[in-house]
Amino acid sequence: MIWLARIVVLALVLAAMPERAAASSPLAPLPATIRVNISLLGTSYAKIGSTGSLTVTREDGAVLYQGFKNTLARRGVRRLADPSETLVSVRDPDDRRSLLQLFRQARQRAQVEDIPIVTIPFEFSIEGDGSDPLAAPLFSAQQITGLHYVASGGLLTFNGRAYRGTLDLTRDDEGDMIIVNQVDTASYLASVIGSEEPTTWMPEALAAQAIAARTYLATHLARHDNYDIEGDTRDQEYDGLAGEATSTVRAVDRTAGLIATYNGRPIEALYSANAGGMTEDSENVYANALPYLRSVPSPADEIAQASSWGHTSWQWTTEFTAPQLRSYIGARGIDVGDPERIDLTRLTATGRVLSAKIVGSSGSRDIGKDAPRYYFGLRSTLFNVTTHPEETEYVEASNAERVRQLEFLGATVVRTFTMNVKDPDRAAHTLRVLGWQYRLPARFVFTGKGYGHGVGMSQWGAQGMALGGKSAEEILRHYYLGIEITTLGGA
């Protein structure tokens, strides 16, 4: 399961969405293939290869490369205007391990000999063995140039991750470089399930996720020019082949074409990792009050508490000293001086923070709805915050997680607790550390429950319901009120 919350980007998208009216026309099936943006924001480097043979073509059909090596597409590459005029040479790899050091030497030589360094807006090259990092690229241009990647006898790889289908280097809606994976819709859905949830979860939980993911896809297509959907938490997490498993493929197959509808139209099938025991009304996170996204109990969320890796999605604690909090919120555009207190000014009926005020030495700032997750780096808005003065705390030596947290806060060890242990086979004694007493600085302590926005289906709750014998349809009807399970057709 991906515990990253669907944050500000998703909020902005959904805020502008009107509630859908009932439709008289039949629902169109999903397309056989979809285009998924698999790059992060601000991508400037793409390493693309294949487990078989790779062919790369330009938009005009010209073949740039065909072979078995990795390719590199880069923006803003700094190069010598005329490498032949410099005395810099590439030494043996043992003598010149750092390409950064080599570049610095080249830059210094260029400064001495007045050889200009230019910035190449876009270039395409083949990854070599490192023997000549200053080698000219296969192709360069003054702007991002569309490229098409096809694998023969294998799968494509992007930055080390394998993908089915084809890849395209293109531009997003703002003109930035992105990599788009065109893949059959069934494979996309199978990967989303395994990228969002553990593939070992109960079949009914995976089936519920399959229907929710398919429904989400049906309502979020055709919003971009060069791709259909984001491949991360801006829409749905998609890890390519790594997300697929026999269980997720089976979940897609057994629910083929099924989506959740309300008044004959696909719903906004929102979901999050853990609702903390109670889901939230949609208008308390997004803009619209949707009748099927009402607050409902989610008691099965508590099963996460027994998980060695998922327990922090049920209950969690986040701590900041005042300087740390000032730095954290400052990086997100809030400057109130040194934070002095945080007032939770409005709560929802479920206890989630609807608005808060940060009061500091030089002012205050109000934040609302789902924003506290972003500004404070929290797992959910179902939280409380307290201020703690300087104090001491004992930590057992086995509690490595708490030791790491205290080191982050700048806590200092004031006493070490040890005991002598006698070796029964020898006369020697060994000193065993039992724990430490730390002095903690004054700090803000956020304690909360849940992970994500809390609207719609809780993934941990769905797993708990499945363990209790509930079907996928029963799970979906619990979290999305008044819905029908409808055959859409397609994947």
Predicted regions mapped to residue ranges:
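Conserved, single-site charged/polar hotspot
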Residues: 2-491
